[in-house]
């Protein structure tokens, strides 16, 4: 055997050996992971845990007696950096103010949570719902009725999250 053919033979043998060893290492890793518990969630059926501070779909809350919490102070409208909130209010016979129009443009909203922090009566909150995809842009213009409906649907989860989050405010 000549010197170059010997080198070629050794390189070929070494390359085959490394390929085989690496292949075996890959099989070992694959077998190891095959018998470990799975970390993937099957999303629509299983959902991962949400942080108590998660900011999702907006909702307007009511008091336990059914009265709206919003006192039309308009702090949320003023503090909103995206100018996504529009409020119109009128005074009632008893002297208190209530909203006649409360609109949120969810397309503009940046989910910063400033509206929730500014509200003195916890009327506007960002709930736990993150699945609110729509087919048209118009469906993302939330009016007062839609926001109140969200509040009724998610009230238990919202109250629990606010209770968990209370020490941090």
Curated annotation (Swiss-Prot):
Q: Which InterPro entries match?
A: 4Fe4S_Fe-S-bd (IPR017896), 4Fe4S_Fe_S_CS (IPR017900), NADH_quinone_OxRdtase_chainI (IPR010226)
HAMAP family recorded: NDH1_NuoI
What is a GO molecular function of this protein? NADH:ubiquinone reductase (non-electrogenic) activity
Residues at which [4Fe-4S] cluster 1 binds: 70, 73, 76, 119
Family indicated by similarity:
Belongs to the complex I 23 kDa subunit family.
Q: What is its EC number?
A: 7.1.1.-
Q: Which reaction does it catalyse?
A: a quinone + NADH + 5 H(+)(in) = a quinol + NAD(+) + 4 H(+)(out)
Q: Does the keyword Membrane apply?
A: yes
One Gene Ontology cellular component annotation held by this UniProt entry: plasma membrane
**Chief location:** membrane
NCBIfam families in the cross-refs: NuoI, PRK05888.1-4, PRK05888.1-5
The record's annotation in SUPFAM superfamilies points to: 4Fe-4S ferredoxins (SSF54862)
The answer, when asked if NAD is one of the entry's keywords, is yes
* UniProt keyword list: 4Fe-4S, Cell membrane, Iron, Iron-sulfur, Membrane, Metal-binding, NAD, Quinone, Repeat, Translocase, Ubiquinone
Location comes to: Cell membrane
Give the organism the record lists.
Wolbachia pipientis wMel
Q: What is this protein called?
A: NADH-quinone oxidoreductase subunit I
């Amino acid at each position: 055997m000549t010197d170059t053919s010997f080198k070629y033979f050794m390189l070929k043998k070494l390359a085959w050996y490394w390929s085989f060893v690496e292949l075996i290492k890959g099989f070992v890793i694959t077998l190891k992971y095959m018998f470990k518990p799975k970390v993937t969630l099957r999303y629509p059926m299983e959902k991962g845990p949400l942080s108590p501070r998660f900011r999702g779909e907006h909702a307007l809350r009511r008091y336990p007696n059914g009265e709206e919490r919003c006192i039309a102070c308009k702090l949320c409208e003023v503090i909103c950096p995206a100018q996504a909130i529009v409020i119109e209010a009128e005074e009632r016979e008893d002297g208190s103010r209530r909203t006649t129009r409360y609109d949120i443009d969810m397309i503009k909203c940046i989910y910063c949570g400033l509206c929730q922090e500014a509200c003195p009566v916890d009327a506007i909150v960002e709930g736990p719902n993150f699945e609110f995809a729509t087919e048209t842009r118009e469906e993302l213009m939330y009016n007062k009725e839609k926001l109140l409906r969200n509040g009724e649907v998610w009230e238990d989860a919202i109250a629990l999250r606010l209770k968990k989050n209370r020490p941090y405010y």
